[in-house]
């Protein structure tokens, strides 16, 4: 596969935001991971990250084979997923666009990263490994992410029902951010994307 990382670069605002969130060490890991993804996939930037939860692998059954795959744990700061149903795998897909913007159909392709597993805070490694993939994806150009999880706490719901999250409180006492003690999470959840998912 050719080395197609020449176009890989973060704009000043993205670099500043990533640096503010990750600190110097996390920024270095994120950039290194983004370069690894670009080298392994031959794609300098990706558009979307999808992180699958337990039992969600079948959600992509209708997608074609990925253009490239690598182990999540090969990326700096990312650990081998240990939760049941999670895999140590990151896939790169090319997906045709077919959405409307300003009333007109937009063509082209999406470059999509799909993580088939993740690290959870309850595993005891602290927040760094939990957010490492998200930071790497941001450094790789990703501007939107879809996080999928199993909600076993909702006993009245059926398997496969979809719920979108619009806000949350961090009650863990743990934070991956360098900076303010309280981070307002309302802007994290995208209302337009939630609408597209059918909430």
Give the label of every model feature segment:
Residues 187-199:
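Active-site rim beta-loop-alpha module in soluble metabolic enzymes
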Residues 1-2, 199:
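Accessible peptide chain termini
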Residues 2-185:
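Metabolite-binding pocket within alpha/beta catalytic cores that recognizes anionic/polar moieties
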């Amino acid at each position: 596969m050719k080395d197609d990382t020449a176009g890989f670069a973060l704009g000043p605002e993205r670099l500043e935001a990533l640096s503010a969130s990750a600190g110097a060490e996390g920024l270095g890991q994120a950039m290194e991971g983004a370069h690894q993804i670009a080298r392994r996939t031959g794609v300098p930037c990706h558009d979307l990250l999808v992180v699958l939860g337990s039992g969600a692998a079948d959600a992509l059954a209708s997608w074609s084979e990925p253009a490239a795959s690598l182990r999540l744990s090969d990326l700096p700061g990312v650990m081998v997923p240990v939760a049941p149903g999670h895999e140590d795998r990151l896939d790169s897909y090319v997906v045709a666009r077919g959405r409307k913007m300003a009333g007109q159909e937009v063509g082209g392709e999406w470059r999509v990263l799909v993580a088939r597993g993740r690290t959870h805070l309850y595993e005891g490694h602290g927040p760094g490994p939990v957010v490492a993939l998200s930071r790497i994806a941001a450094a790789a150009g990703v501007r939107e992410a879809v996080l999928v999880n199993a909600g076993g706490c909702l006993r009245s719901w059926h398997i496969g029902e979809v719920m979108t999250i619009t806000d949350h409180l961090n009650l863990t006492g743990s934070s991956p951010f360098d900076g303010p003690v309280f981070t307002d999470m309302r802007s994290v959840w995208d209302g337009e994307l939630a609408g597209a998912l059918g909430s």
